[in-house]
Amino acid sequence: MIDTFGRSITYLRVSVTELCNLRCRYCMPEDGVCKKEHADMLTEDELIQAVEAAAALGITKLRITGGEPLVKKNIVSICRRASRVPGIREVCLTTNGILLPELARPLKEAGVSRLNLSLDTLDPQKYAHITRRGSLDDFWKGFHAALDADFQKIKLNAVLIGGFNDDEILPLAELTRKYPVDVRFIEMMPMCDSSGFGPEAYIPFTRVLKALPEAVPAAKDGGVAKLFHLPGALGNIGLISPVSAHFCGECNRIRLTADGKVKPCLHSNAEYPLKGLDFDGMKAQLEAAILGKPQWHGDLDVAHKSGAGRNMNQIGG
């Protein structure tokens, strides 16, 4: 479906839960979030019906997110059913990787073709600090389980934070030489009030490229990421800059929260409820959300301070 500004909307990000087994500082409060009543969340059948309605409007790609989607007990069933919806060509999933030793192969068999894994640091102590409770050893176990499951593509996402991991740009990028993965550096966005990070946390991508003098532009399309390549590497380096160089003009996505709200923009207060609707009702709301998609996200700091809604774990990134 084409939105008001001529963009083809083909990508739906689906948050299946707000809950997580980690507490990453830029994503959610230290105490987590209050678990909502089961009746307030989309059921599996409602979620699949929403995917069917989205596919009827031209959505072809799904990304399953959270929270942490792998804490959802029926995550494999959700992925299997979503991958079989007519019109859906690709089902991807974003995870912290901790539960992949048990779930990587079942997810691949259920139709998930691509994985994004969160990895902000290679230092075990810093990993425990940023996640508030995670173990880097557990991450690597999940990562290798994903490699063994032979997904079509694996990407590692690192949120750049000044004074925390800006000294690890090269070591993180070097993972593309060791493994057949992409490493993507993501600008810090003003989302979570409890993060404790100030303006100094923002890292311009000129500093990333300065830390990677060997990197050359890669010709391959990276979607929202600007791609670079290290000589001899097995994967690419991506730079995602929603703050300094927003990609609103090419944005092709909408988001569905775990409690059944469609968000036309990550940084907008606008939400279109789907919970309790039949197929036609969901389709109408999805169409309204697409037509209500703003031309650009505006000033992110202003949007954040005005309460653009939710912490990142409640939206799905």
Q: What would you call each of these model-derived segments?
A:
Residues 28, 104, 131, 266, ...:
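Short, flexible helix/strand-to-coil boundary loops that buttress conserved ligand/catalytic motifs
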Residues 16, 20, 64, 93, ...:
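Conserved, mostly hydrophobic/aromatic
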Residues 4-44, 266:
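Canonical Radical SAM [4Fe-4S] cluster-binding loop centered on the CxxxCxxC motif
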Residues 1-11, 178, 188-317:
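Auxiliary Fe-S-binding modules of radical SAM enzymes
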Residues 41-64, 71-186:
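Radical SAM/AdoMet-radical enzyme domain recognition
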